Amino acid sequence: MTTAVARLQPSASGAKTRPVFPFSAIVGQEDMKLALLLTAVDPGIGGVLVFGDRGTGKSTAVRALAALLPEIEAVEGCPVSSPNVEMIPDWATVLSTNVIRKPTPVVDLPLGVSEDRVVGALDIERAISKGEKAFEPGLLARANRGYLYIDECNLLEDHIVDLLLDVAQSGENVVERDGLSIRHPARFVLVGSGNPEEGDLRPQLLDRFGLSVEVLSPRDVETRVEVIRRRDTYDADPKAFLEEWRPKDMDIRNQILEARERLPKVEAPNTALYDCAALCIALGSDGLRGELTLLRSARALAALEGATAVGRDHLKRVATMALSHRLRRDPLDEAGSTARVARTVEETLP
């Protein structure tokens, strides 16, 4: 039996409102949609950064992806969505041992959020008086095994960025207060969006995103008309619009599931490894994270397309999104990093 794709957006009061805009109904923005799908196939890619103009569907695409994601198995009531009882943190009070299927967590990290809201809060008085580890889990606990979404991530406060960097590197959240220590797994796909006109992202956080995509407003009339038409139809009757696009959304979900099964079997021949290395050397990228992300993304694309091995075409397709945000700025090159990668790909991998 097929699981319905619809997922309702919670309102500020907690009430459920209309369903999210379907992923398959988003017009254009193919690079952005592909980058999000690749992280759904292989979360180990490391997340997606989407920078671009306002009103280009950045937030819509992220929330639409959430409705597509396959469910996960987790212990009922576990605050970190542990897959089995043995992995439940010792501080968590979980009354059930049942393993249930639940939606993949997608958690918003709002601007201006406090540190305790992100990492969780310790009740020191209760710990001292009763000897109990009283811990209120934060957003990182909720995001474990799912997605953490940051809109306008370039406006995040520095101390929150530092927290995210530490957790993204270790995969574990550690909260220490007055000699007490709490820890729990915090492995999630980081998805950030923002407008470059509002400020740059710190290089340390920028490098933690596996893929980076630039989105622009469509420049041709036909595309803009189609965007208007679909949005107007959705606003008039969201449920009917969702039903119309449900089959295509279900096709995409099935593609994700099938690609996940194929992924471990996709081979990376030596020619692909040499292509990765040659391209990164030509671009002058620092370290090896670029090559590793490039190869991993190409493998996910191959799995998504049903291929058995990574080919040059796969590498060329994902090179810009995997490498453009890792380049040093060249003040003499006015074309920008995206154009530099595209140009170098054509020269190095003809």
From Swiss-Prot:
CDD domains, alphabetized: AAA
Catalytic reaction(s) noted: protoporphyrin IX + Mg(2+) + ATP + H2O = Mg-protoporphyrin IX + ADP + phosphate + 3 H(+)
Annotated EC: 6.6.1.1
Domain of life: Bacteria
Metabolic or biological pathway, per its Swiss-Prot or TrEMBL entry: Porphyrin-containing compound metabolism; bacteriochlorophyll biosynthesis
GO MF annotations, alphabetized: ATP binding; ATP hydrolysis activity; magnesium chelatase activity
InterPro entries: AAA+_ATPase, CHLI-like, ChlI/MoxR_AAA_lid, Mg_chelatase_ATPase-isu, Mg_chelatse_chII-like_cat_dom, P-loop_NTPase
Record Pfam families: AAA_lid_2 (PF17863), Mg_chelatase (PF01078)
Keyword Coiled coil: no
GO BP annotations listed: bacteriochlorophyll biosynthetic process; photosynthesis
UniProt binding sites for ATP: 52-59
Keywords: ATP-binding, Bacteriochlorophyll biosynthesis, Chlorophyll biosynthesis, Ligase, Nucleotide-binding, Photosynthesis
Claim: Cell membrane is one of the keywords in the record: no
PANTHER family: MAGNESIUM-CHELATASE SUBUNIT CHLI, MAGNESIUM-CHELATASE SUBUNIT CHLI-2, CHLOROPLASTIC
Function: Involved in bacteriochlorophyll biosynthesis; introduces a magnesium ion into protoporphyrin IX to yield Mg-protoporphyrin IX.
Sequence similarity: Belongs to the Mg-chelatase subunits D/I family.
UniProt name for this protein: Magnesium-chelatase 38 kDa subunit
